[in-house]
């Protein structure tokens, strides 16, 4: 059974996980509003951003693109597959965007501490 992380629109509610350099992860997340209710993602466009917390710049996987797969759209559940394995240790912030028309909503962050073995 997969662990499902709730990502909210409140950037103060941070979810933290750890991973090893060389790991290639998929995360299952549920997008929820400020009240904790799931956001229906049936229609609209999803995006993901990986940011190095220390520098504020994009975290580089060295190639590839993130894969976002809607699992249970009405419940706001999707999987986020990294573009590649983590190449370097860092503290990373993953945020997910959901766009319908001209309205962009942002969820997260999921903070990932990538550790060197």
Outline where the language-model segments fall.
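Contiguous segments within soluble domain cores/interaction surfaces
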Residues: 1-117
């Amino acid at each position: 059974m997969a662990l499902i992380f709730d990502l909210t629109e409140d950037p103060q509610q941070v979810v933290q996980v750890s991973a090893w350099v060389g790991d290639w992860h998929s995360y299952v997340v549920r997008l929820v509003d400020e009240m904790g209710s799931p956001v229906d993602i049936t229609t609209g466009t999803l995006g993901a951003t990986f940011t190095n917390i220390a520098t504020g710049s994009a975290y580089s996987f060295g190639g590839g693109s993130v894969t976002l797969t809607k699992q249970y759209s009405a419940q706001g559940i999707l999987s986020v597959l990294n573009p590649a394995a983590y190449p370097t240790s860092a503290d990373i912030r993953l945020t997910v965007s959901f766009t319908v028309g001209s309205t962009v909503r942002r969820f997260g962050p999921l903070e990932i501490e990538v550790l060197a073995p």
